[in-house]
Amino acid sequence: MARKKEFEYEEKLDIAMHLFWEQGYHVTSLSDLESHMKINRSSIYPTYGDKKELLLKCLDRYQKSKLSEYRSFLSDGSDNALEDLVKLLNLAIQQSIIENRVCLAVKMIFEIALVDEEIRHMLLANEKEIQKVYQAVLERGIQQHLVKKGLDAKTAAAFFASSSTTMLKNYVLYRNRTETASMIRMLVNFISR
């Protein structure tokens, strides 16, 4: 029985996550959550906490999944870090292209992180982990003599992580895959030898 309950817990959490993703945090009401998750308020609170706690659980689940995708670039042992940078930047925007929606973390950064410190800290911690992935790939590029000599990998990693959000914005507005791919190549060329 515990196995079934755990499955339902995760399944319902995914439903809530997609609802926050679709509607945003502020627009999503407890009534919306009850209706979509098919559980009542008296079950939501003891299981998931209040609406904000539920969002935190959803963000945690989402960020762990995305971070796992990013970290896969650290274990593949590629001999071309620049190609991995292109793949990393593509990963950051592919969801918008394929699923026609912006990254949940990016959405929450702009919707709620300015006014909620707890959520901002959670999103910031995740961003720092993503930057570590970029930094490791950039350092590999330096070792492979593919990246300009003297590049500050830590600052460049922060720049690449921020740039992926900017390119995501560009794609959402213009819906031009070719231009987005060109921007990614241009960004990588800026640091190439």
Which ranges hold each PLM region?
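N-terminal intrinsically disordered/low-complexity leader segments
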Residues: 1-7
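Generic hydrophobic, amphipathic alpha-helix propensity
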Residues: 8-19, 33, 58-62, 66, ...
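Helix-turn-helix
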Residues: 11, 19-53, 57
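Hydrophobic alpha-helical connector segments
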Residues: 57, 71-100, 153-160
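Amphipathic alpha-helical segments used for helix-helix packing
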Residues: 84, 97-118
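C-terminal peripheral helix-coil segments that are non-catalytic and often amphipathic
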Residues: 87-91, 95, 132, 136-140, ...
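Amphipathic alpha-helical packing segments from all-alpha helical-bundle domains
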Residues: 98, 117-143, 155
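Hydrophobic alpha-helical segments that form the core
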Residues: 149-170, 183-190
